[in-house]
Amino acid sequence: PILEDDYEIPWPSLSVDPLNLSKLLEKFGFDKSSKSIAICPGAEFGPSKRWPTKYYAEVVKHYLLEDWQVLILGSKKDLPVAREIEDQVSTKDKSFLFNFTGKTSLEDSVDILSTCDLVLTNDSGLMHIAAAVNVKLLALYGPTSPKFTPPLSKKARIIQKTEGFEKTRKGKLVDGYHYGLEMIQPEEVLESLSCHMNDVL
C-alpha cells in the first residue's frame, strides 16, 4: 500500500522484562530506586566515533561524588575502554560504580537502561536501545551525522561540534579520536546533563 504524505512511522520501542530485571538487580547489587546514570563509551568503529575516555572519566567522577550510581555498559570489545575509565577513578569512590561491560546480553542492557535517570553515549547501538526504552539520553556525535542516525526519542539530546557527515581524514584525529569529539568538553556535557535532568518531558 502507498502511505499518505502525512503518515508518521512510529519510532522503535522496546519492552522491559520485569523478571529478568529483578534477577539482574539481585546479581549485580545495584538499586533501581537510587539515581543512576549509564555510560556507554564504546563504538563499533573504534576511537574515531568515541568521546575520549579521559572525558568520560571526568563525568563518572562527578556523578560518583554526587552519590549517583554509575553504570558502564558495552560489549566485550569495549572492555579496554571501560577499564581505562575505571582506572581513572580512585578506589574510595568506586562504591557506586558498576562495570557491566562484557557481562550482559543485549536483552539485559534493555532492562538495565530502563532503570536509569540519564544515559550518556556515543553514536552507537546502545544509544538506539536507550532511545527505544524512552529514558533521558545525551548523545555525542563526531564523524557521523544525527540527520542520518539519530536517537529516535523526544527524550534525546545531542551535542555535535561539526556539521554534517565528517569523514575521518589524516589531520582530523587527536590521539585517535575525531577532532569534533575532542572539542566537546566535559564541562559542557555535565551542564547539558544537568539541564536535561531537570527537563519536564
Question: What role is predicted for each listed range?
Answer:
Residues 1-24, 153-201:
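Leloir-type glycosyltransferase catalytic cores
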Residues 41, 123-124, 142-143, 162-163:
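Short secondary-structure boundary segments
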Residues 53-142:
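Donor-binding and catalytic core of enzymes assembling or modifying cell-surface/extracellular glycoconjugates
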Residues 1-48, 86:
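Mid-sequence helix-capping/hinge segment at a functional interface
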Residues 47-48, 80, 129, 148:
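Glycine/Thr-rich phosphate-binding loops of Rossmann-like dinucleotide-binding domains
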Residues 133-161:
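Gly/Pro- and small hydrophobic-enriched strand-loop and loop-to-helix capping segments
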Residues 49-52, 182:
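Short, conserved glycine- and acidic-residue-centered signature motifs
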Residues 24-28, 59, 112, 192:
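CheY-like receiver
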